[in-house]
């Protein structure tokens, strides 16, 4: 990958000039000028997904100049580097190959002179055999009963992805009850353990190194709880499996290393649901549906790696995001799925985006002088409409939004889905076009009221509009379409990082807090006052000690 400061390119300078021409142009004006705007600024994927980006503050010239930026920063070369197994995560000297985990074509992907696909397929086959034994009931717990509950213990990428996907695919789930424990707060595991039976519970401990503080603290508490009933340490092997690469530590914990499922250093945590970390997904929806998830992602991988930038959906969404973040000064993006099963989707890509592109140092090791990753947030519709949409509609901040919805629901109750989708369509229309003062006054006249007598209210009912949105309409949320949607966002994130000259696949920002926590932990063991920190931290620690005494 090349190390090019995007602001030093001629394309960036052209975009800055173009922004000066575009900053006061409204979405309403763009639609008024072009009756064919929707067809020009939308695209479908595999007849399963429609991406409408017409309600953005862009023209064909905007996209052309953004494409020039992608060319000048060698996005095509960056894509080729990732898919070919080059070590593009330079700060950790690692390849980035989550795409290999879903490489259903089985074409060789080489890292350090070795094709990784045989090992990928071997772990998949091992997960298939294990999951079929658990799901069928042929795997028995220490008292001879089949497993009824699965508890995934992990944090970050070892939790967010599997939890999001198992929730999104609940219509496909089997009889097993899935639980997820991530927080080192003892409340999290305590509440889960209240609802499971040690005789019929399987714990998945997801930690590559088997040393992650939060995960191993929870895993040891789970084992203690289990042994309080089971008694004999040998029973641990029937009720615990590991998603890890540290065979020694796994064995010492009491887990049979035959039930250790490996992954590789070229799998980043926040891109790991496709790996052994996805075992909880397989146990929830079955191996065949997991393969469909992989296949959907692989289809998007092929689209991303082979489609020209002008028609490449992840690239288009990434470029539009850069346009708002760097030229309009938009600091956030909202992800708003109109599907209750997708309620963890925004949280998943909050990590996916912010941990990937939340960097202020470029690939040359210099502080950037432009914007990198945005703040990502969101909640399912229509709940969000009754919470934070007020600010999106009438606040002082620009919040570009992605609206996501399925055309077909898994729960066709009465007219629920039509009402849900009527809101989905209405919100993007309202955000784009707003409501003028003239329309507000006419509405009063239609009600037989004189607008002049209501002048004190009229300004508050005006909507400026011109709020940008993308709409992603899926035919239906299936394992395949969900896989494609996740990969769409993954590649959008990669594209932005490549163009913005940052390392997307490391996360050094999570380290300092962990280091300091490890230093503070011994200081919390006794009641003596602490004076080794700044006055604020000392004061907080000492008050904590006083109150817990």
Swiss-Prot record:
Record-linked InterPro entries: G6P_Isomerase, G6P_Isomerase_C, Phosphoglucose_isomerase_CS, SIS_dom_sf, SIS_PGI_1, SIS_PGI_2
Molecular function via GO: carbohydrate derivative binding; glucose-6-phosphate isomerase activity; monosaccharide binding
Entry keyword Cytoplasm: yes
Enzyme class: isomerase
Keyword line: Cytoplasm, Gluconeogenesis, Glycolysis, Isomerase
Record field: catalytic activity: alpha-D-glucose 6-phosphate = beta-D-fructose 6-phosphate
Gene Ontology cellular component list: cytosol
Active site: 355 (proton donor), 386, 514
Pathway: Carbohydrate biosynthesis; gluconeogenesis; Carbohydrate degradation; glycolysis; D-glyceraldehyde 3-phosphate and glycerone phosphate from D-glucose: step 2/4
EC numbers for this chain: 5.3.1.9
GO biological process, one term: glycolytic process
Location in or out of the cell: Cytoplasm
Keyword Translocase carried by entry: no
Pfam entry (one): PGI
Protein purpose: Catalyzes the reversible isomerization of glucose-6-phosphate to fructose-6-phosphate.
Family: Belongs to the GPI family.
Protein name: Glucose-6-phosphate isomerase
Taxonomic source organism: Klebsiella pneumoniae subsp. pneumoniae (strain ATCC 700721 / MGH 78578)
Gene transcribed to yield this protein: pgi
